Regions:
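Long, compositionally biased intrinsically disordered regions
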Residues: 461, 468-641
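Structured, charged N-terminal subsegments at the starts of enzyme catalytic cores
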Residues: 194-299
Length: 641
């Protein structure tokens, strides 16, 4: 049995919530056969130290990294041409002192009165300015993020308002879906919100909320169950059985003959399309299946490594991938079979994690959600016709929300979308506001919807059943004051002069948000409240969102299947290489989806000619994401020219 002192030790840690064990007679053999008691005591001691560190004030440990700050900070500050808003002028004075070596720990006017830094700075020895230097750099970082400090001639860290389109260009753009006068927008939204709150109140009293209820001020809503009709799965299997097996090389040739996507890869100097189509498709295939050019040269019967390198350097770049993808997506949308799945006016977006090499650039970060291995995310937009019309590489730890509008506005396919679905990770009030102003119906599946608060223009006038759900009052005055700049933000996003994610990240970056960011959040709260009421009362909206998100998640499985080489890891060490790898993977997925859509359509047409009519309701559940009939492995042989 476990010695008494050890059992007491385990019980004490169990009370702290650190471990949970059965009585000694049960757990003794399990521990002995595992790490052993010595190993357990080591793990408990390590957990105790980690718990104490995590519970401690982080500022007690920042001096441990002081040497890293000193390695780059003085040179960096000498090179940067900084500008600041009035609120950040005290910080700029402290930066100037640090830059010139006049480190004065008494210069603390840049700190907020309630800042924890004051207590830690007072505890430092006289003449020790190390913690003060770190405080200046931390606050400089936050000021960059909030836009209170900016760099001249910088696109990412420049003055946000200088990057926005001028006010007179708003009316000329014609892309905004809201009135130019804030009074009109506020009057419309107040009338609409009051009406929808009354409708929700009546449904709550009558008990007619679909799959949900509001009881004692608490919202309850059930998750929709899958609603695939009987026979859909059998139909999918039957249709795919009639598609002949094919090699990926033959598939690429057939899709290029139908779409001409290789024409998009023009010479960087002359602008002429690549004359060596087979070589170009070898390069695209090497990126798409995550094989790499050197191993592709060993696996193909047509080109050497140096020939593939030459083609890749002169013809393959990001814009070429975007053009080729647009050609394939447009061609797939024109196929008759695609109409059974949708009209190309709704889409879903989601991030997919890929393990990356330890020695890459800044994209390779550890996100505990995916384990302890560094990686990156491919954030993709998939239309209701299954076409992956946009993808981009983002850090594994980044919020997905700011990138939603990038995929919708940075290419033509996204501009046809009217309703955008996403999961909880893609939702913020800023995104709700920007999507509504630009005319998109933003419909996220919010995991903890019952805990989210509604907002009203007049909370006291809300139905009694709903008052416990009201989180606050909409600040109309703040919206009115900032309406011109809100429209400038939206017009700038629509014009494509600045990436939407760049603007939204900056607005959301700082805890003490500036008034413009807060005003945009107020607009988003109004739009989110309207959406939440729609979601609660409309089971069909919930079902559409579920179907859209399922299409995106199924698309992830196809990408996993085609990127099987190198264990699915993205081992490129540069951000550019990672981008090309993900872009190649997305293009190859789109090519397979086009080919499957074409072949499924041919099978359906043949059955129709034979007098066998298939139900459109069943065909809507057929997916072009199958790959079992495609030979992705082995040697990649092409017909001789």
């Amino acid at each position: 049995k476990m010695p008494a002192f050890e059992w007491v030790h385990v019980q004490l840690h169990q009370q702290k919530g650190m471990i949970s064990l059965s009585p000694p007679t049960i757990c003794n053999s399990a521990i002995a056969s595992g790490s052993g008691w010595d190993g357990l005591k080591t793990l408990v001691a390590m957990a105790t130290r980690l718990t104490a560190t995590m519970a401690d004030d982080p500022l007690n440990h920042v001096l441990d990294g002081y040497h890293r700050f000193r390695r780059y900070a003085p040179r960096m500050l000498r090179l940067l041409d900084l500008r600041a808003a009035p609120v950040a002028l005290p910080l700029l004075e402290a930066v100037t002192a640090l830059r010139t070596g006049l480190n004065d720990a008494a210069m603390t006017s840049f700190l907020r009165p309630s800042s924890k830094w004051h207590r830690h700075l007072r505890a430092q020895r006289a003449g020790d300015a190390r913690l003060w230097e770190i405080a200046v750099l931390f606050h400089l970082r936050d000021a960059f993020r909030s836009g209170d400090v900016w760099l001249t001639r910088s696109r990412r860290y420049g003055d946000l308002k200088h990057a926005l389109v001028p006010a007179q260009a708003i009316a000329e753009g014609g892309r905004l879906a809201v009135p130019l006068r804030p009074e009109e927008w506020l009057a419309d939204r107040q009338a609409r919100l009051d009406m929808r709150l009354r409708e929700l109140g009546r449904a709550a009293r009558a008990g007619t909320i679909p799959g949900g209820s509001i009881e004692n001020g608490v919202l309850h809503i059930e998750k929709l169950e899958a609603a695939a009709p009987t026979g859909a799965e059998d139909l999918v299997l039957d249709l795919y059985k009639q598609i002949p097996p094919t090699r990926i090389t033959d598939l690429l040739l057939e899709v290029d003959a139908a779409t001409g996507f290789t024409e998009a890869f023009t010479h960087l100097r002359t602008g002429a399309p690549c004359a060596d189509r087979i070589g170009l498709m070898n390069v695209i295939l090497a990126e798409g299946i995550n094989l790499g050019l050197r191993k592709m040269a060993d696996a193909t019967n047509t080109h050497t490594f140096w020939e593939l390198i030459r083609i890749g350097r002169w013809h393959v770049e990001g814009e070429a991938y975007d053009r080729a993808l647009a050609m394939v997506v447009e061609a797939q949308a024109a196929l008759p079979m695609a109409r059974f799945w949708g009209m190309g006016t709704s889409a879903s977006s989601d991030g997919q994690f890929f393990v990356a090499t330890e020695q890459g650039e800044a994209m390779n970060l550890v996100n505990a959600k995916y384990g302890n291995t560094p990686g990156l995310k491919a954030y993709s937009h998939v239309s209701d016709q299954y076409a992956p019309f946009a993808t981009q590489v983002i850090p594994a730890t980044a919020s997905e929300a700011p990138y939603i509008l990038d995929g919708l506005l940075m290419n033509d396919a996204g501009r046809h979308i009217r309703e955008q679905f996403t999961d909880t990770g893609g939702f913020t009030d800023h995104v709700f506001a920007a999507c509504a102003i630009l005319g998109y119906r933003f419909a996220p599946r919010i995991r903890d919807l019952p805990s989210k608060r509604l907002y009203a223009f007049n909370p006291s006038a809300a139905p009694a059943h709903l008052r416990a759900l009201i989180g606050g009052k909409v600040n109309q005055a703040m919206i009115e004051r900032n309406w011109p700049d809100i429209l400038r933000i939206a017009a700038t996003i629509a014009a494509g002069t600045v990436a939407p994610s760049q603007i939204l990240r900056k607005l959301a970056s700082y805890p003490r948000q500036n008034e413009l960011a807060t005003a945009l959040r107020e607009v988003g709260r109004v739009e989110r409240t309207l959406f939440m009421i729609d979601w609660i009362l409309d089971a069909e909206l919930q079902r559409r969102a579920q179907i859209g998100l399922n299409k995106g998640e199924a698309h992830h499985a196809l990408k996993r299947a085609i990127s099987f080489h190198r264990r699915g890891e993205i081992r490129d060490r540069s951000a550019e290489g990672q981008h090309y790898r993900i872009a190649g993977m997305n293009l190859l997925a789109a090519i397979i989806i086009f080919w499957n859509t074409m072949k499924l359509g041919e099978v359906v047409a043949n059955q129709k000619r034979d007098g066998k009519l298939l139900s459109p309701d069943l065909l809507a559940h057929v997916s072009p994401l199958g790959w079992e009939h495609i030979n992705l492995t082995g040697e990649y042989r092409w017909p001789k020219p």
